[in-house]
Every structure is written in structure tokens, then in C-alpha cells.
Amino acid sequence: MGFMDFLAKMGENLPAVSKPKDKPTLTRKLLWTFIGLIVYLLMASIPLYGVTSSNSFLSNFLAQQIIFASSQGTLAQLGIGPVITSGLIMQILVGSKLINVDLTTQEGKSKFTQAEKALALIFIIVESSLFGYVFTRATSNILLPIIVVVQLIIASYIILLLDEMIQKGWGLGSGVSLFIMAGIMKVIFWNMFGIVSVQSQNLPVGFFPLLVSYITSGRNLQEIVLNTSSTTPYQPDLIGLIATVGLTILIVYLVNTNIYIPVTTQRLRGIRTTVPLNFLYVSSIPVIFVSVLGADIQLFASLANSISNSASGILTDIANAFFFPPQGVPHSVYALVVDPVGAAIYAAVFIVLSIVFGMLWIDVAGLDPKTQAEQMIRSGIEIPGMRTNPRIIEGILSKYIYALGFFSSLIVGLIAVVATFLGTYGTGVGLLLAITIAMQYYNLLAYERTLEMYPLLKRIVGE
């Protein structure tokens, strides 16, 4: 029995959510999506028994909280980190042919899903054990570590089941995307309208309540135009607000920009149409990879601190290149003045790795010209004036796809870096993720609504 078979067998025996017998209506899907979101938000608000703010140690890492949709010191401490990490690893293993699974068959898809679920559980157990040890290492109560670990394992597995419930058709989209978007929107909303600060989750008083306070008290408004305070590094400012609005408009425009390739179909001879390739061909995948890599390094650096100071120091130095500004430095344009060298290193590392991961993702995820050419031929799509030969079509597509892959990776990396430098609300990566996920949900809602209005379309699209 191979590694994949072992994981798949393990996944089959885990508690699971069954698919609905009949396809739920859009209203029902929205209801279950809302229920899943409420359950997740409640878990993100319930503190872990036996863990206090004084012995939790990741309160300064806003980036981790956003990428993993986690909430410090709560039942959602791990967030969707194990699910994301296992998914990325499985995609890489299958895409690079290190594990042979035919994802075009129902059996292959099922095997992949079960293996991914089992690997996520392994990560849940490992990370829960590490957190349980670090959170309770100062206590003499031998039962407390076990209690914390059990809480984390159960809560994290419930989050996994919530994601599974939504993906299997009870809800809309995926739980991973939904929880990430909810976490980011919470941060952005709080940065605008929060009336109190929540130090444990890096949530300051919002910009607008602060603006009202400054006006009524007659204080100098220049202080909230640009945050230069090291005592309140997460305090939002006016420049960050303007940058958030401006970059939101830019990202929405780019997400809706397509490059069109002229094609014909074998079924409709003589009729020409186009196949759209999104300008952001790899979407936000590159910045997710870079952020997850940095967050994981930072996480293990913090966990290693209680085991080996030297190992923790090395990992921390590496992780610092992935995040900016450093701890205690204002999250605003002022950070460029305080630490210009760190800003340059961060920009170089983030942009270069975004390009590297973006180009790798094209081959790993089946977005490469060869795979796309084969799919076009199977669908009966041809390029006018060219023979129906996979190699010829592959050569033509390669001119578009690799250029789009490079520039889209470069652009999303640049957007994330510039957004971070300008102090956008929710961080640069968070804003990029929130908008792309929101656009996906908008298109999904429009699709589902159209199918409900015109039932005949269900037969045409095979639903």
C-alpha cells in the first residue's frame, strides 16, 4: 500500500459530511452557508480553556491570522491552516507527478479528496500538540496540556467539516474561501468602524470613530493622516483608507480584464468565437503560497523558541523577510522611513517568490499550454487556420499563457507589496484575497440565480 492509498483509506474512515440527495435551492444553500459562517465566527470568539493572553504567543502576527483565518487564543487558533497546507501539498505532489492520481475520473477525485482530508487531520494533530505544549509549558498541571490539545483537535476538525459541508453542495463555494474572506472583512470593518481596541487580535480603534474623537476634542488631525506611533502600530490612518479604496478599484478592474484567443468549434463550422484567459491568470495563488510559506516559517520559529534558541533565531530571521513592517513599527508609509532596508528585502523576496510560485503553479495545476491544448481538442475547439494538432495549438497557447503567468504573478506580487507599504486595511495580501474571493462569490451567485430562473439551462450545463 502506497502513501496515497494509506491516506485515502484513512480518510474514508473519518467522520464526514454526506452530499445532499437532491440539489438544494439557492435559498437553502445561502442558509447553510450562513450557518457555517456563524458557527465559525462563534468558535473564533470562544477562548481556549486554560489559555490566557499572557501565555499565548502569536498575538503580534496579523498576517498569520489573515492567511489562516485564525483567531488568537480561541477555538479557531489553527483556523484553516491545516486544510490549506494539506491542500497545497497534495496539489504539488499530484501536479509534479510524485503521486499518480487520475483526477479526470470520479474514483481519482474521491481518492484525492480523502487523502487530502487525512493529511489535514495529521497536521491538526501535530499543530495542536505543539500549541498545547507551548501554551501550557509554564504550568505544573499535567492535565492542562491534554485539555488544550483535545480542544484544538476537536475544534479544528469541526472547521474541516464545515468546509466539507459547504464544498459538498450544502452551501456556496468553499469554507476555506468563506472563512478567509470573513476574517479579512472583519479586520477591514474594524479598522474603519471599531469603537474599542482588541489588543489580543491586533484590532485598534477604527479610523472614523478616531476621527470623530479628534474633531470633538480639538486634537491635531495630522496625527491620523499618517500613523507614526510605535505604541499603536496597527492604528489605521487616512493614507491607508485612501489606498484601500484605490487598490480595491484597481483589483476589481484587473480581475474583470481578459485576453481573448480567437477559436472555432467543430460542431459549428464557420462560426468564430473567443476563449477568454483572465489577465490575472494565476489569480491570487502566488501571494497565497508566499504568505503561507512565511506564516509557516514564522509559526515554527515561535514554536521552536521553547526548544532551541539558535534554531528559532535562524527561522525568525528567514521569516522576517516575508513580512513587513517588523513588530513595533507603524503599519503605514512611515515604516519605509523607519526601515528602508527591510522594506527593500521584503519587496524583493515577495515579488521574486510570487513569480516563482506563479510559474510553478501553471505546470502543477494543469494550467500549462500542453494541458490546455489537450482540453481544447477534447472539447472540439480549434484555432482558425491551424491544424487540429496538440503541438501546434500548444505552441500558440504558450505565447499567451507563460506571458500571462509571469506578468499576473508580478502584478499580484506588486499589488500586495505596494498595499502593505501604504498601510491598507487588512494588509496587502488580505485585501487582494478578499476582493478575488468576493468576485468569485458574486459570479457564483449570479450563476446559481440564473439556473433557478431558467431551469432549462440545467440540462444544457449538465446539472
Swiss-Prot record:
Residues 61-68, 69-80, 81-89 dip into the membrane without crossing it. It is a multi-pass membrane protein. SUPFAM superfamilies: Preprotein translocase SecY subunit. Its main location: membrane. InterPro entries: SecY, SecY/SEC61-alpha, SecY_CS, SecY_dom_sf, Translocon_Sec61/SecY_plug_dom. It holds the Pfam family SecY. It is found in: Cell membrane. GO terms for biological process: intracellular protein transmembrane transport; protein targeting. Residues 48-60, 135-142, 194-236, 306-341, 424-426 are extracellular. GO terms for cellular component: plasma membrane. PROSITE patterns: SECY_1, SECY_2. Residues 1-20, 90-110, 168-174, 259-283, 362-404, 442-463 are cytoplasmic. Keywords: Cell membrane, Membrane, Protein transport, Translocation, Transmembrane, Transmembrane helix, Transport. The chain crosses the membrane at residues 21-47, 61-89, 111-134, 143-167, 175-193, 237-258, 284-305, 342-361, 405-423, 427-441. Component of the Sec protein translocase complex. Heterotrimer consisting of alpha (SecY), beta (SecG) and gamma (SecE) subunits. The heterotrimers can form oligomers, although 1 heterotrimer is thought to be able to translocate proteins. Interacts with the ribosome. May interact with SecDF, and other proteins may be involved. HAMAP family: SecY (MF_01465). Belongs to the SecY/SEC61-alpha family. The central subunit of the protein translocation channel SecYEG. Consists of two halves formed by TMs 1-5 and 6-10. These two domains form a lateral gate at the front which open onto the bilayer between TMs 2 and 7, and are clamped together by SecE at the back. The channel is closed by both a pore ring composed of hydrophobic SecY resides and a short helix (helix 2A) on the extracellular side of the membrane which forms a plug. The plug probably moves laterally to allow the channel to open. The ring and the pore may move independently. This is Protein translocase subunit SecY. It comes from Sulfolobus acidocaldarius (strain ATCC 33909 / DSM 639 / JCM 8929 / NBRC 15157 / NCIMB 11770). The lineage of its organism: Archaea, Thermoproteota, Thermoprotei, Sulfolobales, Sulfolobaceae.
